[in-house]
Amino acid sequence: MLDRFRTAQAGSIARLRRLAEEGQLPAPWNFSEINARPGFAAALRTAGAPAVIAEYKRASPSRGVINLDLTPADVARMYAENGAACFSVLTEAAHFQGDLRFLTQMAFAGRPMLRKDFLLDPLQVVETAATPASALLLIMRMFADAQAVREMLDACRLYGLEAVCEVFDEADLDLARAAGAEIIQVNNRDLDTLATDLGVSRRLAARKEEGELWISASGLD
């Protein structure tokens, strides 16, 4: 499954490289001095445990279209009214019918937003910075080595974004730490097999280190 997601990124990355060559990459989102890009990790820490990251996903490969009756704005309003600390927004188009514009449509709710996609190239960090997102997802299994992850983390710091490094097992966790990850998200659903096991979070949590912010994702009702 991850190979399919990786292949689907080729067109987006090629488009961004053409824009870079032409000097036409999008400018960073223009926040006002008063209303700066909200802190993702800070919001989770302030909310305390358990802090909820509420996800907006229009469709999925396994379920197809989930809901077309509610707009991204409708969902953002309901999530905010019910106490979500942050939003996670699927922007991948080919398999999840996502769109970067969802981030703009949900920003009014004032919650820090995580761009959830299958990002591989630092130019996609630049693209994310042109939206009101506060953070982006980096899936460790998408990267060949720690240096590739480190390049993405460096780009995030340069553009004022936070990186959520997603892991499925001990090897992924070792890779994230070797690259300098500060926010670790344990996905209980293995994207290679789509099997869900809440025991993954319980097992890996034993390796949490001081100063790290950890998130458990998938399979939680």
Question: Which residues are covered by each model-predicted region?
Answer:
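Structured beta->alpha junctions
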Residues: 91, 117, 218-220
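Generic beta-sheet signal
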Residues: 116, 139, 166, 186-187, ...
